[in-house]
Curated annotation (Swiss-Prot):
The N-terminal domain probably binds unfolded/aggregated proteins; the C-terminal domain interacts with ClpC. Belongs to the MecA family. Enables the recognition and targeting of unfolded and aggregated proteins to the ClpC protease or to other proteins involved in proteolysis. It holds the Pfam family MecA. Signal peptide: none annotated. It comes from Streptococcus agalactiae serotype Ia (strain ATCC 27591 / A909 / CDC SS700). One of its GO terms (molecular function) is protein-macromolecule adaptor activity. NCBIfam families: PRK02315.1-4 (NF002643). This is Adapter protein MecA.
Length: 251
């Protein structure tokens, strides 16, 4: 297994067929998302010594490209939380019901109403950010594998969120109305942390960032990685945390 940093925001992890076999994985396992695939991603991330600028990212995207003799896993960190003022985002209303087009239109109007003369430039930066990770993966594949037939690319995104108390965790869980591939709940000191894995198959390129923005309405940006939480925290719910917490009725 080899890791290469191809940009400030993207890592490329190459895993041979022998490594896959040793982990009990086959190429077909990546075509239909399942718990086995989730654990594969987590185990790879736990083993690797990630660069410092990746260790504190609250959102990591996984994109898998199977090849004839290996798979390439592209891991991209998002800088969305640094590019958007979350207080301004909260002023936009219920973005969970907005289409992507309405989201950008509302954000632009909010900037203009606040006298932001750079509103259009900021919108362009946000849109470019959402396309950047996908473009990096495409360019890397084209430059290295022009003569090689590609198999369908499958993507996943992994988030970590922080909460001050268990009530906040339950309220967050009850706002989730879209499919979650996997979720875990940890306790570290007085705080709580949740990991979430989403499947990006058949989703538009902006889906991961839009879901991240929606969830940040009810959560704090993650300050720990899953590897750190597994080693230093108490795991309260091992799997399907969202569904289990949704069964709790708040008084």
């Amino acid at each position: 297994m080899e890791m290469k940093q191809i940009s400030e925001t993207t890592l490329k992890i190459t895993i041979s067929m022998e490594d896959l076999e040793d982990r009990g994985m086959e190429l077909k396992d990546f075509l239909i998302p399942q718990e086995k695939t989730e654990e594969f991603f987590y185990s790879v991330m736990d083993e690797l010594d990630l660069p410092e600028n990746f260790k504190n990212s609250g959102m990591l995207s996984f994109r898998v490209t199977p090849k004839k003799d290996r798979i390439d896993v592209f891991v991209t960190k998002s800088e969305l939380s640094k590019d958007l003022n979350l207080e301004e985002l909260a002023d936009l209303g219920d973005i969970s019901k907005m289409s992507p087009e309405d989201f950008f239109k509302t954000l632009e109007q909010s900037m203009l109403e606040k006298g932001d003369t750079d509103a259009h430039a900021k919108l362009a930066e946000i849109e470019n950010m959402m396309d950047k990770a996908t473009q990096e993966v495409v360019e890397e594949n084209v430059s290295e594998e022009q003569a090689e037939k590609e198999v369908e690319t499958i993507g996943y995104v992994h988030y970590v969120f922080d909460f001050d108390n268990i009530e906040a965790v339950v309220r967050f869980s009850q706002t989730i109305d879209f499919p979650i591939e996997a979720s875990e709940l940890y306790k570290n000191g007085k705080g709580y942390h949740m990991t979430i894995l989403l499947d990006l198959e058949n989703q538009p390129s902006y889906f991961a960032n839009l879901m991240y923005a929606r969830m940040l309405e009810h959560a704090n940006v993650g300050t720990k990685t899953r590897a750190y939480l597994k080693e230093h925290s108490i795991q309260l719910i091992h799997d399907d945390a969202i569904s289990k917490l949704q069964m709790i009725e708040m008084g």
